[in-house]
Amino acid sequence: MEYLYEKLTAYGNSDYYAFHMPGHKRNMELMRARLPYNIDITEIDGFDDLHHAEGLLKELQENAARVFQAEETHYLVNGSTVGLLSAVMGCTERGGRILMARNCHKSVYNAVYMNELRPVYIYPEFSEETDLNGEIHVDQIKKLLEEYEDIQVVVIVSPTYEGVVSDIEAIAEIVHEYKIPLIVDEAHGAHFGFHSYFPQNANTQGADVVIHSLHKTLPSLTQTALLHINGRYADRERIRNYLHMLQSSSPSYILMASIDECVRGMDECREEIMDTYVECLQQARERLKQLKNIKLIEAEHYDQSKIVLSVKNLKNTDGEVLNGKRFQEMLRSYHLEMEMASGSYVIAMTGPGDTQEGMDRLVQAVMEIDKNILCEELSGNDEDHTIKNISYEMIPLEQAYSSFEAGRMEGESVKWNEASGRISLEYVYLYPPGIPMIVPGERITSTIVQKMVKYKEMGFSIEGLSQENCLLVAGNPE
């Protein structure tokens, strides 16, 4: 039998380099090798209570608000998930309507279910060239706000998992014309605003509620995050109440100390930490732009911390058609772990925890792989040449029932090839990034079936299937 602690210790002592979260990258020098078991306590005298902060924790949260340029900030020890749940439920009435980006994290969908909300989806524009889902445009939001007058809140993701950034300032302006709040899932942008190389923090761009996953890109432990509230449109008291209900009643002081250390470091050592990191990152990106075949891809408005490397339309010298999953395996042979693989690309997440040695290893490995790749137009007969079909493009599906209604229906398990035309009773996610491709209550199409089957064949992780290669659907075919 394997034991978790021993397995983690062995991995931590190995030479595998992490181009994935958490953002501290196991860099013990940066983390100052603190946070051992001997500081794991409960709410004893002198250490305050997160759920009724009046002393130390109240001061620390106020300090975090100052550092992240927010009016009000709350520590989260259950990750951005509890922040998104509390924000959405605190800004909506039961049964209300929500305008949300289709590429929202599954926690937003869970909030929709819990509050019996009626979602209206904004679909990001998809780039055929890069296979990236693009930004959310203000015109899309304006059109839907005009069409649905009862929308209670708008929720978008910026930056996306791949680093695509939306114009928060313009979106906030149009949303506020309707006197409703804008929630920005900026989980992947906790580093925003700390260096001119990166976009501005959404707190400074008019967002009413902003959620930051500190652990994703900054030096902080997994599960640590912040929820910020600004302006007059978000119901602060209701959000606070949901935080009390949904967040652990025994918040870890180790996690809260990690948040404090992270905030303190970004406040007191910002220039030293960020200048060193950005210089290292810029050098790596410049070198990766020189690749002959593999492409360093990005969007017009982009977070440069994400290194997205595409092998679209490429073969290796053995004639094997490449995809993101295969590329990820090739990089793993160099003891480099990527954050995720998509149909045609991999994502290397970077942050101030990265080292020059780590960046050099990534660049050198990719350059070596690049030498053994052929760039050519693939024919329609090429096996596995289905890059378009295995992209993360959001496919619109008919919403026959709300997710709450679907959750109360009787269902049966059917094979994927029998699911077309049926009503799904469960979520189907590609994980990471945890974005639902199918939501309960939606009618399944042959296109989405083919897409999921292809992902499964290629070894991607599909969560939500009730059984192997089966899907739970409504009992009576419509």
Provide a role label for each language-model segment.
Residues 286-447, 451-464:
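Conserved C-terminal alpha-helix-loop-beta "cap" of PLP-dependent enzymes
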Residues 36-79:
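Conserved N-terminal alpha-helix of the aminotransferase class I/II PLP-enzyme fold
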Residues 4-9, 30-31, 67-70, 80-298, ...:
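Conserved PLP-enzyme active-site core in the AAT-like
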Residues 1-38, 429, 433-436, 465-466, ...:
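N-terminal glycine-rich, Lys/His-bearing helix-loop that initiates the first secondary-structure elements
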Residues 74-76, 154-157, 346-351:
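Short glycine-rich or small-residue beta-strand-to-loop segments that form or flank ligand, phosphate
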Residues 26, 161, 216-217, 232-234, ...:
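Short, glycine-/Ser/Thr-/acidic-enriched flexible segments
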Residues 116, 121, 457-468:
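Short, compositionally biased
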